[in-house]
Amino acid sequence: MNLHMPQDEESEAELKNLAAVPYQMISPANNASIIGVFQDSLLGAYRFTRPDIKFDRREAMNLLMSFNKIDTSVIKKKKEITSFDIMSQIMPPITMKFGNKWFADSGEEYNTSNNVIEISNGKYIRGQMEKGVFGGGGNGLLQRICNYYGNMASADFVDNLQNIVTEYMKTSAYSVGISDLIANKETNEKI
């Protein structure tokens, strides 16, 4: 990674406006998102959006601890908060409904399948996240948030999603490959 040190005010302004990550989320070449959700965050989002994931109030607040716009009325009303309720907290007021990549092969009913992502005015109703939901060329969730609500809203959504699923994965069991556990030569030298 390169470090750019602006030497004058013009260079500083150029970096703030041209090199800022939120303004580089969508590729001008093909109008598709180039920054997205990958690896641990993608696995976490996939596991987090399964239909029967529930939390008590304390667990829900722990997941939302780094989010600064919590709608506490949703959390106060229910004894069990679903992962969809938590996703609704970070979702901008977008409305969309589309099948994920598994829907075509599932043979399930469109109106009831968890392989259909349904969001209504920012309320996450159903659907299991997967790579195509976030990317998907010009039709992905990040692309739509960026188009309708701007670059900063899209960057905030990615940040909030990553914070929530990282906290979720800390308390949710999952397996890793052996290659994830083997330290490289540089790390071994540091140890």
Residues of each region from the PLM?
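Feature marking long nucleic-acid-engaging regions of large polymerase/nuclease enzymes
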Residues: 1-191
